[in-house]
């Protein structure tokens, strides 16, 4: 079953093009994206790999990153493509 996570991401532009995506709270989350319009899909795949890693190693996933069931608002920043 899918869960909703709140995870800060750092997008670092690369000289050769594209971006490296990491998270300061999940050091295992490292991926690259060529086109920022694909970031949701790419990060979702990387996040699924991190979740699987935690399960396989028996490491407990940080509960503070799970957004479901919270009674308070979730701060959400996003990149939005708009205009022409």
Go through the PLM ranges and name each one:
Residues 1-7, 41-84:
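Short, charged, surface-exposed hinge/linker loops at domain edges
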Residues 2, 9, 13-15, 33:
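Short, positively charged
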Residues 11-25:
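Short aromatic-glycine-(Arg/Gly/Cys) micro-motifs in beta-strand/loop hairpins
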Residues 14, 37-38, 70:
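Residue-identity detector for glutamine
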Residues 19-21, 30, 56:
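Intrinsically disordered/low-complexity terminal segments and short unstructured peptides
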Residues 24-27, 62:
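Proline-rich low-complexity regions
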Residues 27-38:
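A short, exposed loop/beta-hairpin motif centered on an aromatic-Gly-Thr core
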